[in-house]
């Protein structure tokens, strides 16, 4: 990677974060320390034109021994200013995960099988996907009311006048989603997520269920109800939704506890507690942005999505003629 940057006339700068070292730093960290660290890295980030993030590790639960309070200090005083506020907004960036045996294990695949899967999902024809997404973007931009029905789910909200954004291989790799945000106080009903979620505290949350009233999560349960409510009590915005997105990558069909993959699952949607994106703003601010996924294909219980009372997707398959180009058989 360094050689390639030099070849095109760039000046590479390298941050090499070892997960074990990061864990030890965070276990006893304090606010003053993290602010100073962020100040240094933020100064460098402001000088950068582009950012390439390559993630990988051998243990996805490395941070499980870090106290929640310390993780929150890191998120608030390092991740938010350096990445969410500077890197995301002001650099040309891309993030991907390097395929490792640990990732293969998460996906319940052999290393060889996962390697083939990895390059297939990452290297699909993004130009074709981008063109196919245009009709969905246009429809979402015209939509007011969204209704989602499924196993343990009966949810309504509005996306009126909040822009829809297509993601087709320009930033996250793999890619394949179209996102917007609900009007902050418009969300009402019940939502049951059926994909496990590995949070940055190293714990895997399962069987997550939220009850919403006027946008706020008023009840939350999971395999560790106390723990998930502690996350949602991080700040006021953590109990409101910052993103609604439809996953359309035809080669990703099951969760593997890696959000770069899981949020793109064909026939899924994610409904994200926490901060919104500037591209699709609904005014919600939080130090968290937690993509939680619900899969609506037949193998995962099915479900229906309606835009302004018109059925647009059933059991993970688009049923409106203008959107059928996004279905798996067209790739």
Region spans (language model):
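Active-site bordering "gate/hinge" segments
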Residues: 1-188
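Dual-mode signal for accessory low-complexity, basic/Gly-rich regions
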Residues: 219-285
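Short aromatic-centered micro-motifs
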Residues: 148, 211, 305
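A short, compositionally biased
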Residues: 139-145, 204-206, 297-304
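Long, well-ordered mid-to-C-terminal structural blocks that present hydrophobic/aromatic surfaces
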Residues: 184-230
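Short, glycine-/Ser/Thr-/acidic-enriched flexible segments
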Residues: 57-59, 100, 162, 196-199, ...
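Active-site lining segments that contact anionic ligands and/or coordinate catalytic metals
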Residues: 188, 205-207, 214, 239-243, ...
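Internal helix-turn-beta structural module
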Residues: 257-330
């Amino acid at each position: 990677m360094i050689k390639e940057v030099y070849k095109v006339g760039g000046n590479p700068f390298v941050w090499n974060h070892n997960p074990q070292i990061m864990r030890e730093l965070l276990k006893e960290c304090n606010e003053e320390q993290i602010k100073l660290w962020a100040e240094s890295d933020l100064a460098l980030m402001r000088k950068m034109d582009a950012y390439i993030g390559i993630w990988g590790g051998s243990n996805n639960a490395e941070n499980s021994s870090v106290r929640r309070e310390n993780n929150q200090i890191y998120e608030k005083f390092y991740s938010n200013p350096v990445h969410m506020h500077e890197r995301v907004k002001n650099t040309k960036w891309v993030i991907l995960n390097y395929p490792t045996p640990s990732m293969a294990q998460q996906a319940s695949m052999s290393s060889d099988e996962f390697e083939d899967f990895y390059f297939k999902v990452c290297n699909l024809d993004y130009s074709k996907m981008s063109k196919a997404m245009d009709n969905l973007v246009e429809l979402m931009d015209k939509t007011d009311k969204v209704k989602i029905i499924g196993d343990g789910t009966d949810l309504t909200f509005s996306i009126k006048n909040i822009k829809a954004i297509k993601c087709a291989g320009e930033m996250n790799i793999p890619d394949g989603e179209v996102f917007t945000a609900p009007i902050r106080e418009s969300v009402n009903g019940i939502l049951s997520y059926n994909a496990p979620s590995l949070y940055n505290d190293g714990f895997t949350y399962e069987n997550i269920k939220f009850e919403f009233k006027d946008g706020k999560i008023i009840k939350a349960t999971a395999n560790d109800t106390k723990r998930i409510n502690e996350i949602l009590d991080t700040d006021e915005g953590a109990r409101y939704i910052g993103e609604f997105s439809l996953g359309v990558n035809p080669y990703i069909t099951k969760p593997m506890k890696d959000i770069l993959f899981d949020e793109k699952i064909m026939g899924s949607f994610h409904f994200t507690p926490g901060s919104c994106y500037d591209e699709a703003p609904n005014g919600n601010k939080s130090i968290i942005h937690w993509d939680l996924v619900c899969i609506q294909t037949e193998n995962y219980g099915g479900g229906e999505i309606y835009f302004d009372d018109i059925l647009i997707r059933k059991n993970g398959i688009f049923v409106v003629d203008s959107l059928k180009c996004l279905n798996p058989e067209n790739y």
